[in-house]
Amino acid sequence: MMGFVKKIRDFFDLDEEKWEEDEYEQEEVAQQPKVEQKQNVVSLQSVQKSSKLVLFEPRAYAEVQEIADHLKNRRAVVVNVHRVDRDQARRIVDFLSGTVYAIGGDIQQVGSTIFLCTPDNVDVSGSISIVSDDEPTIKRW
């Protein structure tokens, strides 16, 4: 029987003396620096502090550029044009309409002579009825 086992060992090359154990060296793995990811968390207080609403009562068309500059700087503006004549008021509203269009904002009439101009970072919800039963009807813009 030993002959049979020896033949199998020789066939499969299972001779105990031929086996050498390989020596394994442990490789040092280079530590890669951790990539710090910036978190996409913004404090609500910082967002609220940076938002501003500016009120204007222009007395001349020349003031409209200052109003537009506030819109370009992403500030909402409420404009009351009651201090200028109707033609000047129309020019002011036309200029501001072009400005809010260019910056992707919005303009809404919230009173007979009051307009709310908002840049694209300000959302306005709700609506205000301009004409009520108590007020006399005024021609719309």
UniProtKB/Swiss-Prot annotation:
Location (main, coarse): cytoplasm
GO term, biological process aspect, one: FtsZ-dependent cytokinesis
An example Gene Ontology CC term for this record: cytoplasm
Organism from which the protein derives: Anoxybacillus flavithermus (strain DSM 21510 / WK1)
Family membership: Belongs to the SepF family.
Biological function: Cell division protein that is part of the divisome complex and is recruited early to the Z-ring. Probably stimulates Z-ring formation, perhaps through the cross-linking of FtsZ protofilaments. Its function overlaps with FtsA.
Location(s) in or outside the cell: Cytoplasm
PANTHER family noted in UniProt: CELL DIVISION PROTEIN SEPF
Subunit structure: Homodimer. Interacts with FtsZ.
Protein's UniProt name: Cell division protein SepF
InterPro entries: Cell_div_SepF, Cell_div_SepF/SepF-rel, SepF-like_sf
Gene: sepF
Keywords for this protein: Cell cycle, Cell division, Cytoplasm, Septation
Alphabetical list of Pfam families matching this protein: SepF (PF04472)
UniProt cross-references to Gene3D superfamilies, sorted A to Z: SepF-like protein
